[in-house]
């Protein structure tokens, strides 16, 4: 979680930011699985789905930037929210999903995952698990840092003069992004759509 997050903060290539972010997010899955609790396992499964939705949105955002702007270098970007409004909204939803902010599916997944880890730590009275829980919270702050930093550099600030003629992507590129954005919000508001299917299996795995 920490290595991927720290490396993401140091990248200029937006695709590399998302690639290192994926490494960090896989750490969350192992974090939840390691709790061996029903909620922790279910949270890890939900995080897996949320990561697919959120990171899919972010990589599609990178694709729009490459096609419409011609670069994926963060140091050359800025102020594109006014030129790519739909892309910007979808990118924000994708980032919120990865950060675990409501009303996206990432919130419920992350909440269940951390609750499961804390539950196991309290039941066992294990200081190591309690420390891991605290470190997980710190890693979440790191996740928020590199994603907010990315959004600021791409969509906010001053628009470079050479981007004055940039236009929003066509609907062939935007439609899939809007579908994924819709899925993550619907799943965030109605998590039982997913949880009712997987909870019995997670209870069987955890022995709960």
Q: Over which residues does each language-model region extend?
A:
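Cytoplasmic/organellar membrane-interface segments at the starts of transmembrane helices
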Residues: 81-87, 144-208
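Hydrophobic transmembrane alpha-helices and their helix-loop junctions in integral membrane proteins
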Residues: 1-152
């Amino acid at each position: 979680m920490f290595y991927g997050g720290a490396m993401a903060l140091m990248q200029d290539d937006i695709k590399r930011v998302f690639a290192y972010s994926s490494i960090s997010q896989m750490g969350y899955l192992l974090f939840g699985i390691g709790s061996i609790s029903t909620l922790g396992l279910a949270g890890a499964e939900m995080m897996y789905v949320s990561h697919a939705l959120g990171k899919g949105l972010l990589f599609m955002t990178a694709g729009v930037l490459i096609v419409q702007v011609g670069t994926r270098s963060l140091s050359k970007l800025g102020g594109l929210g006014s030129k790519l409004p739909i892309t910007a909204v979808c990118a924000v939803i994708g980032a919120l999903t990865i950060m675990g902010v409501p009303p996206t599916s990432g919130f419920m997944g992350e909440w269940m995952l951390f609750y499961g880890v804390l539950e196991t730590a309290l039941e066992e009275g294990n200081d190591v698990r309690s420390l891991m829980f605290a470190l997980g919270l710190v890693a979440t702050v790191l996740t928020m840092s590199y994603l907010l930093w990315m959004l600021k550099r791409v969509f906010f600030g001053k628009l470079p003069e050479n981007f004055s003629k940039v236009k929003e992507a066509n609907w062939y590129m935007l439609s899939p992004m809007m579908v994924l954005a819709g899925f993550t919000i619907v799943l965030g508001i109605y998590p039982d759509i997913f949880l009712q299917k997987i909870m019995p299996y997670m209870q069987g795995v955890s022995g709960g």
